[in-house]
């Protein structure tokens, strides 16, 4: 359905893939239209399978009705234009057929003569009349009011003639019947046309009637003179004095005069020629009469300036946005001026170019204005090159969307020439480089005028068409001073001769979009590939993050039809496209884009009704320049004369007559930005504070000044002597106004105090001014001396104050604070500002970290920092986070543990070393787990895991002492009483020696049945079944024991306990037990069901270490995301010998949880939270 119409219309600059036919397919590069945008989120494929779906096209069926503003309400006479058009169209068709076929003329002779005599002019043979009727029928269907007037006048005239004939009488019965019937038909037609007057609303150009008359008169005169000359040359039997009249009758009289009135006949072939002369005159006149396209189909300077302003504000997402500045387009704006649509009218189709330009929120208003314009002039709306978001907007306005293909988008950050998939491009680039080609990349503004003139000359000489092509995806002007930000990429040979060029227009501030591609016939193979690759590889230095290349029409059809197992319809459709590719190079374009491994982004065509698809296709072919109509204005210089900019925007004086971009800051001030109206949507309390801020600024008060240190903290001020002069800074938490005296509560990190403002004590101003300028939550600096209120409350007697930070949003409830736990996490800054308990928690965490460091420093440990970004994930069994480094084009992992790097330091001789830092594990989130956490790892040479039992206990007890003032842990407790349930924390003593138990003994006690390291797998599985513990069949005995431990021991432990001697198979980095077979020297510290830390006697045997890591790597290769990868660098370091070492790993977050009795989300300042 219209495929032959849409394909060529999407080419970019009027060329095929190659501009020199001698090149082979290996160096083809697309040079057609393109189109970007992001996702296909808004457009879902039609639910009902159709032929377009089977072929690989996604036809978007419309289920939404047009908004009321886009269509006129249907009246009972809405059918009149179509009925009139069809009636006249049938007569026109029969008249044309009768003019070319004597047989048809003989068959319809009787009804034709009856219609001609009594109903409607239906001459014997006359091309002119046939074509005029066809144009009249089309105009009637398009609801042109001038066509209604022409038809009505014809009916009235015919009715008057019939009425006169009836009144004259003397006719035969047959003639009387015909005249009466004709008169009745005319009266009915006149009544229907008058009643349907409002259905013919489409306008034509002003003065169309006079222009049409002038065209017809000129054409008729030329036709009569030419026909007279032919009659004189070939008179046949026609009398000399009747030749001029005969010619005039045939040319302009529609052969209405009976041929018998003339003496003789000219040669037969002349009648057809005479009719053509008349046809040309009448067709020209009719076209001018019914034409609704504006004469100035172009942008004015103000229009272009407004478009550039909208692009600066909103154009960062639209790769086709810059093409809206093409000057042979017209534009229609939303009433607000925040969005617009550029378009061109061809063959009665108003063809919109891509997405609306401007604020997405104003797109519906721009589409509505465009549809109203189409309706006013009777144009059929059509869209070429819409993005997914744009097509969704057009759908919501009542149009249908059809996916045409995909645009190739390159992401320079991901582009590389290495890899098997880039072999073709790499080889082409190598060939071009061997030929000595280099690439030069410059902005147009950096090119001298004479050099740009040479560039334009080269572009014209290398073009394989007479004129530039393009509409929706081409700029059509090279070297214009207004396009100084465009990018020129040139391929230069060793003799400094330019052999090829790419010109790209801006796509926002960080992208470029291909506009022009040219190459010399002498350019070597791979020239285009070299330019594209060099542009992508050097994009970062140019500030480019995305490159829009060419458009692949029906890409999905090529791709799906070539897949293994593709259905017969998909293969047939692909075969048809391959066949047509002989002329339109469709497959070549797809493959030339595909070789760069781009991101494919869909583009759409939109239309109102399936019946207008051919017209939309023809309009796109004409607009793109593939079909040039007679008297086309395509190659003329386009400068519009009638600005379309809304008066509100034009009146600002920001727009420029030369089309240059306006001042963006000025556009923001007149409300053309996303911030327009923000304050009107703010809550009332926030709006009041913004208003107060504006008043302060207008009074010359800086609400956010440069800071200066206060002389005292609040705590120090409260401890200062009476009458001591102090200055403090803090946040206002409460205000009590008693007229001349005002009390406020001021809080800083150290505490809270009362400040007293008395008019008699203030150096300047009064308390009322303070009350008017400040709100709760404001930051202020207070100066004065310490004293007391009448009630004896220690207070700062204020002599001067300064606002140092205006709080523009109200604080939470001053009594209850933030009660919602999720809100406390997401707005931790507010939680800390109003909640003393939260400030205590963050202080306790700091104390824990400091105590851990001080304890280790006291024992001679050295603190180091090891890489967080690692090439391999190892050191623990956990799922890692993956990121990517563009410089080396490789994946990296956020470390799950620093162990392997710390052991490298141990090999180097660092005997006591630790790291206190962040680790990352892509696992669950709950009360005790966060994907990002703080981990302590410490290693001590010449020690084992047993030495770390006392060391770990000492670290935790010292941390508790620092945070709580005693070696105690806080545990949640719930008491139920008469006044309800009360939740609180109670201290638990954790001083002294903590229990130590083996893993197998603890499990045996929980099961009531003895197990050890020699217990078989079958027995362990039976015990799991009996205890209800799940397991996997691929697990070995060690993994099953670990599962029993986690379900039966770890989760039931309360007091801090060390569980030692874990199975060897689940401890890949731990040395085997020195005396027990099947277990490793490892312990886990557990308290109240949470593992706090673990320690190993580290495995220092490099041979055994390699064997175990190879087992882990096999698991990783088999799909286990938590298994460690083989780290050859680490193993090589171990082969240089590491001393016997004991290692400790401890989760600092869990230690803080133990000491404070809080969850991990409460103890972390900013735990990971789900997005809203």
Curated annotation (Swiss-Prot):
It is found in: Cell membrane. Residues 726-804 bind DNA. Mg(2+) 2 binds at residue 1091. One of its GO terms (cellular component) is plasma membrane. GO terms for biological process: lipid metabolic process; lysyl-tRNA aminoacylation; response to antibiotic. Its main location: membrane. Residues 17-31 have a biased composition (Polar residues). Residues 664-1172 are annotated as: Lysine--tRNA ligase. Residues 1-663 are annotated as: Phosphatidylglycerol lysyltransferase. SUPFAM superfamilies: Class II aaRS and biotin synthetases, Nucleic acid-binding proteins. Its cofactor is Mg(2+). It catalyses: tRNA(Lys) + L-lysine + ATP = L-lysyl-tRNA(Lys) + AMP + diphosphate; L-lysyl-tRNA(Lys) + a 1,2-diacyl-sn-glycero-3-phospho-(1'-sn-glycerol) = a 1,2-diacyl-sn-glycero-3-phospho-1'-(3'-O-L-lysyl)-sn-glycerol + tRNA(Lys). It is a multi-pass membrane protein. Its EC number is 6.1.1.6, 2.3.2.3. In the N-terminal section; belongs to the LPG synthetase family. Catalyzes the production of L-lysyl-tRNA(Lys)transfer and the transfer of a lysyl group from L-lysyl-tRNA(Lys) to membrane-bound phosphatidylglycerol (PG), which produces lysylphosphatidylglycerol (LPG), one of the components of the bacterial membrane with a positive net charge. LPG synthesis contributes to the resistance to cationic antimicrobial peptides (CAMPs) and likely protects M.tuberculosis against the CAMPs produced by competiting microorganisms (bacteriocins). NCBIfam families: lysS_bact, PRK00484.1, PRK02983.1. HAMAP family: Lys_tRNA_synth_class2. This is Lysylphosphatidylglycerol biosynthesis bifunctional protein LysX. It comes from Mycobacterium bovis (strain BCG / Pasteur 1173P2).
């Amino acid at each position: 359905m219209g495929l032959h119409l849409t394909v060529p219309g999407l080419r970019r600059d009027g060329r095929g893939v190659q501009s020199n036919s001698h090149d082979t397919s290996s160096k083809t590069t697309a040079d057609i239209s393109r189109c970007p945008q992001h996702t296909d989120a808004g457009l879902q494929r039609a639910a009902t399978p159709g032929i377009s779906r089977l072929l690989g096209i996604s036809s978007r069926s419309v289920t939404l009705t047009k908004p009321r503003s886009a269509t006129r309400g249907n009246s009972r006479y809405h059918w009149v234009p179509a009925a009139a058009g069809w009636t006249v169209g049938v007569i026109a068709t029969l008249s044309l057929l009768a003019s070319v076929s004597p047989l048809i003329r003989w068959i319809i002779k009787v009804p034709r003569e009856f219609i001609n005599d009594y109903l409607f002019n239906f001459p014997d043979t006359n091309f002119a009349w046939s074509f005029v009727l066809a144009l009249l029928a089309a105009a009637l269907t398009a609801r042109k009011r001038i066509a209604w007037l022409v038809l009505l006048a014809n009916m009235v005239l015919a009715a008057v003639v019939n009425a006169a004939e009836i009144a004259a009488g003397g006719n035969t019965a047959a003639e009387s019947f015909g005249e009466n019937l004709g008169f009745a038909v005319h009266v009915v037609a006149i009544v229907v046309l008058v009643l349907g007057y409002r259905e013919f609303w489409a306008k034509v150009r002003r003065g169309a009637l006079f222009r049409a008359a002038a065209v017809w008169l000129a054409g008729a005169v030329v036709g009569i003179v030419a026909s007279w000359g032919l009659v004189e040359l070939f008179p046949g039997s026609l009398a000399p004095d009747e030749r001029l009249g005969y010619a005039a009758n045939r040319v302009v009289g529609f052969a209405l005069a009976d041929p018998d009135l003339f003496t003789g006949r000219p040669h037969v072939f002349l009648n057809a020629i005479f009719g053509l002369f008349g046809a040309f005159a009448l067709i020209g006149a009719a076209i001018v009469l019914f034409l609704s396209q504006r004469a100035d189909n172009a942008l004015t300077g103000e229009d272009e300036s407004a478009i550039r302003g909208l692009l600066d504000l909103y154009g960062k997402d639209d790769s086709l946005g810059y093409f809206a500045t093409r000057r042979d387009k017209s534009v229609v704006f939303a009433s607000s001026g925040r969005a617009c649509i550029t378009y061109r009218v061809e063959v009665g189709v108003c063809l919109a170019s891509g997405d609306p330009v401007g604020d997405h929120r104003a797109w519906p208003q721009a589409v509505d204005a465009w549809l109203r314009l189409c309706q006013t002039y009777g144009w059929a709306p059509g869209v070429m090159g819409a993005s997914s978001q744009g097509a969704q907007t057009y759908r919501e306005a009542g149009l249908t969307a059809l996916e045409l293909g995909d645009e190739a988008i390159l992401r320079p950050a991901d582009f590389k020439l290495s890899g098997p998939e880039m072999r073709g491009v790499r080889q082409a680039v190598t060939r071009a480089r061997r030929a000595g080609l280099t690439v030069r990349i410059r902005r147009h503004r950096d090119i001298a005028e004479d050099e740009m003139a040479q560039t334009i000359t080269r572009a014209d000489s290398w073009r394989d068409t007479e004129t530039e092509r393009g509409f929706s995806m081409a700029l059509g002007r090279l070297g214009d001073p207004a396009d100084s930000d465009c990018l020129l990429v040139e391929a230069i040979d060793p003799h400094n001769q330019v052999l090829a060029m790419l010109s790209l227009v801006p796509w926002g501030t960080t992208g470029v979009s291909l506009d022009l591609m040219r190459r010399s016939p002498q350019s070597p193979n791979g020239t285009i590939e070299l330019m594209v690759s060099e542009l992508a590889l050097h994009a970062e230095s140019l500030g480019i993050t995305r490159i829009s290349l060419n458009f692949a029409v029906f890409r999905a059809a090529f791709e799906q039809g070539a897949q293994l197992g593709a259905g017969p319809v998909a293969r047939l459709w692909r075969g048809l496209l391959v066949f047509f590719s002989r002329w339109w190079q469709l497959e070549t374009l797809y493959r030339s884009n595909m070789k760069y491994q781009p991101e494919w982004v869909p583009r759409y065509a939109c239309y109102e009704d399936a019946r207008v698809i051919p017209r939309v296709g023809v309009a796109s072919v004409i607009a793109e320049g593939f079909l040039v109509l007679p008297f086309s204005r395509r190659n003329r210089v386009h400068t519009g004369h009638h600005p379309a900019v809304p008066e509100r925007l034009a009146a600002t004086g920001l727009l420029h007559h030369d089309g240059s971009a306006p001042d963006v800051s000025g556009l923001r001030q007149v409300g053309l930005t996303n911030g327009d109206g923000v304050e009107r949507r703010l809550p009332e309390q926030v709006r009041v504070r913004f208003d107060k801020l504006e008043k302060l600024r207008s009074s010359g008060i800086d609400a956010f000044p440069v800071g200066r240190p206060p002389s005292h903290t609040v705590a120090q001020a409260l401890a200062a002597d009476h009458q001591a002069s102090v200055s403090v800074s803090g946040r206002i938490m409460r205000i009590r106004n008693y007229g001349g005296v005002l009390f406020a509560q001021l809080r800083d990190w150290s505490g809270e105090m009362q400040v007293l403002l008395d008019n008699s004590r203030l150096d300047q101003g009064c308390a009322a001014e303070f009350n008017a300028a400040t709100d709760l939550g404001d930051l202020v600096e207070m100066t004065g001396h310490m004293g007391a209120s009448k009630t004896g409350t220690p207070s700062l007697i204020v002599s001067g104050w300064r606002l140092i930070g205006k709080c523009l949003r109200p604080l939470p409830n001053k009594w209850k604070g933030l009660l919602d736990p999720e809100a406390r996490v997401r707005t931790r800054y507010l939680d800390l500002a109003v909640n003393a308990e939260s400030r205590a928690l963050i202080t306790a965490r700091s104390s824990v970290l400091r105590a851990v460091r001080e304890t280790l420093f006291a024992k001679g440990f050295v603190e180091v920092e090891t890489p967080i970004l690692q090439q391999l994930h190892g050191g623990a069994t956990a799922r890692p986070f993956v990121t990517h480094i563009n410089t080396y084009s490789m994946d990296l992992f956020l470390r799950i543990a620093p162990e392997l790097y710390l052991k490298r330091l141990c090999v180097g001789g660092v005997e006591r070393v630790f790291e206190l830092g962040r680790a990352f594990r892509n696992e669950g989130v709950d009360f005790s787990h966060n994907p990002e956490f703080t981990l302590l790892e410490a290693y001590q040479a010449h020690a084992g895991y047993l030495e770390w039992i006392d060391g770990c206990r000492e670290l935790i007890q010292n941390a508790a002492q620092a945070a709580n003032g005693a070696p105690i842990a806080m545990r949640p407790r719930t008491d139920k009483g008469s006044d309800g349930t009360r939740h609180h924390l109670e201290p638990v003593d954790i001083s002294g020696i903590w229990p130590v138990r083996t893993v197998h003994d603890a499990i045996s006690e929980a099961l009531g049945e003895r197990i050890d390291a020699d217990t078989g797998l079958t027995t362990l599985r039976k015990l799991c079944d009996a205890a209800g513990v799940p397991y996997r069949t691929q697990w070995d005995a060690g993994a099953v024991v670990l599962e029993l431990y986690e379900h039966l021991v770890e989760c039931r432990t309360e007091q801090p306990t060390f569980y030692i001697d874990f199975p060897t198979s689940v401890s890949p980095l731990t040395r085997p037990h020195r005396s027990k077979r099947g277990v490793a020297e490892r312990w886990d510290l557990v308290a109240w069901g949470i593992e706090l830390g673990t320690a190993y006697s580290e495995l220092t045997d490099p041979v055994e270490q390699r064997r175990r890591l190879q087992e882990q790597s096999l698991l990783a290769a088999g799909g286990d995301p938590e298994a460690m990868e083989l780290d050859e660098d680490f193993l090589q370091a171990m082969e240089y010998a590491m001393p016997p070492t004991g290692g400790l790993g401890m989760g600092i977050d869990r230690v803080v949880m133990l000491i404070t009795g809080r969850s991990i989300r409460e103890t972390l300042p900013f735990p990971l939270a789900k997005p809203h």
